[in-house]
Amino acid sequence: DEVRISIAHTCTDYDTAKAAFAAGASHMTHLYNAMPGITHREPGPIIAALEDGAEVELITDNVHIHPAMVRFTFNTFGADRVILIADSMMACGLPDGQYSLGGQAVTVRGPRATLTEQPGTIAGSATCLFDCMKRAVLDMGVPLESAVRAATLNPARSIGIDADYGSLDAGRYGNVVLVDDKLDILKVVRHGEVIG
């Protein structure tokens, strides 16, 4: 069984991140979140990931990352290295209100989930992956083809299931979300069967 190593929620510096990638890390979880930013004197783990070919995850819920940084990431890392994720907590799809995450009280308003005791601290997301993909296209200016790839093929490849999932190539499972021109869902097909 293959193990994939990811750098996540880290205070590491550039050199330490480079050493981690040289030792086999190949992925960066929740890019930009809870990690040092990029500066000209301290490039940090983000530049190490860029240089070493790492796959990077983006939470495109209109809360975690500014749209300009999302576009920057697609443009610099390339659409084949970006993986869209939702980082959803249990409140995803539920009404605004009070929820719990790991024993901590969380307040949800729209896509924003914050610690109730620390309202400025993000506590996951209340947005599903499809809506993150939709937001990336409609609100952040990511090309549709790039956003779909980042939500389907790239994550499947990252965990080694792209022989069966992630695209509509021959021999793969027929999983499809049919949308209209506003990216609203019309139908969902799972393993070739319409389920919604």
Report residues per predicted region.
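Active-site core of metal-dependent hydrolases
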Residues: D1-D96
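Short, Lys/Arg- and Gly-enriched loop/turn segments at beta-strand edges
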Residues: K182-V189
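C-terminal intrinsically disordered extensions
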Residues: T10-D13, Y99, G103-V106, L183
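Mg2+-dependent phosphoryl-transfer enzymes with acidic/Ser/Thr/Gly-rich catalytic loops
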Residues: G196
